[in-house]
Amino acid sequence: MSNKMWGGRFGEGPDAIMEEINVSIDVDRHLYAQDIAASKVHAAMLAAQGIITADDAKNIDKGLDTILSEIRNGTFDFKRALEDIHMNVEGRLGEMIGAAAGRLHTARSRNDQVATDFRLYVRDVIDETDAALAAFQHALLTRALEHSGTVMPGFTHLQTAQPVTFGHHLMAYVEMAARDRGRFADARRRLNESPLGAAALAGTSFPIDRDATAKALGFDRPMANSLDAVSDRDFVLETLSAAAIASIHLSRFAEEIVIWTSPLVGLVRLSDKFTTGSSIMPQKRNPDAAELVRAKTGRVVGALTGLLIVMKGLPLAYQKDMQEDKQGAMEAFGALSLAIRAMTGMVADLVPDEARMKAAAGDGYATATDLADWLVRTLKMPFRDAHHVTGRIVAAASKQGVALHELALQDMQAVEPRITRDALAVLSVEASVKSRTSYGGTAPKNVRSQANAWLKRLEKERKLG
């Protein structure tokens, strides 16, 4: 006969391989706080509904508090034979308070129990991630204000395109992080329904109060369908999707830092705090923090892909496949958390080489569009014609091996006789960025205005809690 808590109908215990593949305590032990919180609420509801006695509920609550302390101080004995966090907690509770512990599982299954625990866990992850992304935004905004007028090259196809400001470039990641936070917030809203009380799949015949347990656990409402409640993992998938997109944003920025810190480019420098050396080459300073942020994206995207594949063919309701929903997700959430903190540190740490940035901003005839715009504004030339004329002027400068602003006026006039000396004023990189005053443009005053507005918004969020 099996000695498992579920073993009443079994004539013998499981094979050792079955034990090994079935156990999940190494992973779901991380749900201990959520499991205990949900059990305390469930016990209180059972007592309020007259399903168990008030004394039993009191003993259960006190015992769960003790177990929570034991886990936190490292004295709790996790037993692999008990499979998971739910049975480990219930088993220890039975050792402490006896038969009353067996009443805790009334009107509840491990199916709705784990669904509740994991929703609470993911909700906590979302809240922590939002706070981390807000701190990342604050670091970006602080540096954007410092460098609202620092000119650097803007790129398309990794080729110099037009001058921008370093502050404007950093502000792009503020906006990306804002969308990331919005996606996490959306996921949280859909997540915030309680599966507790759905039992195995069909609900229960006991007169439970699901509204009360949902409210006590901070959920907006109980889930409306018991089958859906125990078999849904959309909340994990959606949160992993938000995490994957956020990690891709961080990876893009990390890639830029790797490129910018290369001696061949030399636009920024990271201090020793965020670089490492080589075991053989004494001179090396490697941007390993940025490279590892870039690499961790694979773990996050991989976790999303893995869970999508796990869930794709599962009929209703709960299937043991769903036990594989946690490890990859937990690792992904941890990887994202570390990546955000690392990027926040690097943003505060990096030092731009302003002279090199300014010089690079003018490379590749980056102010050619400014000349074309001058032809449109001053000579009323159609833009397509202005584009063609400017292209010929760029070709002339390239043939002479000079920058656009170094080309003689008469050489420009050889292409378009109506060009005047006034056109030369628009060819400096400073004039170029100052002229981009359209909403969302790179003009320093735009950057300062948007950065200050964002800082006020973050401060308002902080005060609202």
Swiss-Prot record:
Q: Which GO terms describe its biological process?
A: arginine biosynthetic process via ornithine; L-arginine biosynthetic process
Pathway(s) per entry: Amino-acid biosynthesis; L-arginine biosynthesis; L-arginine from L-ornithine and carbamoyl phosphate: step 3/3
A Gene Ontology molecular function term of the record: argininosuccinate lyase activity
Q: Where in the cell is it found?
A: Cytoplasm
Q: Which UniProt keywords apply?
A: Amino-acid biosynthesis, Arginine biosynthesis, Cytoplasm, Lyase
Q: Which CDD domains match?
A: Argininosuccinate_lyase (cd01359)
- Cross-referenced PROSITE patterns: FUMARATE_LYASES
Q: Name one GO cellular component term.
A: cytosol
Catalytic activity annotated for this protein? Answer: 2-(N(omega)-L-arginino)succinate = fumarate + L-arginine
Report the EC number(s), separated by commas if there are several. Answer: 4.3.2.1
Q: Which Pfam families does this entry report, sorted A to Z?
A: ASL_C2, Lyase_1
State the InterPro entries in the record.
Answer: Arg_succ_lyase_C, Argininosuccinate_lyase, Fumarase/histidase_N, Fumarate_lyase_CS, Fumarate_lyase_fam, Fumarate_lyase_N, L-Aspartase-like
The domain of life for this entry's organism is Bacteria
Do you know which PANTHER family this protein is assigned to? ARGININOSUCCINATE LYASE
Family from the record: Belongs to the lyase 1 family. Argininosuccinate lyase subfamily.
Q: What is this protein called?
A: Argininosuccinate lyase
